[in-house]
Amino acid sequence: LNEYLRLTSGETHYMVRYPEECDQTLEAAQKRLQAMEDHERSFMLAAFLDGELVGNCGVNAMSDHFKMRHRASLGISIKKKAWGLGLGKLLMEKVLEQAKENGFTQVELGVFADNDRARHLYRKLGFTEMGCIPKAFCLKDGTYRDEVQMVKFLMD
């Protein structure tokens, strides 16, 4: 998993971390995955191409408090070599379907404002842009990027 995170984090600036920040110990990674497995509604799907991990998409409960139980955050990453295959769309469709089955009625995500490809996909899947956080990300070169907050409601 660390290797996958390092690779995807280095392929584009659209990830929230740099490759050198993906250095979880095996124990920490296992603990993180176990916590997700133990949570009754949070989950992650992985995509493999010829036995190689090329994508993952997951949903995490934002809170277990009653007033926020309906909300989940979504994260996704796809290796560049698998871009354009429809994998992101497929993973997100499956994750959104499962999120609804798990009782979530609202799924939220944040995306780099200059990531037009991702924003297009999210809008195509029914997400709506709700706001923008200026200078949410500071890159190593000293420049900043805004973050667009998006939401999809899963109610019938």
Regions found by a protein language model. Give the residues of each.
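Acetyl-CoA-dependent GNAT
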Residues: 9, 21-81, 92-93, 153-155
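Conserved catalytic-core motifs of GNAT/GCN5-like acyltransferases
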Residues: 108-111, 123, 128-143
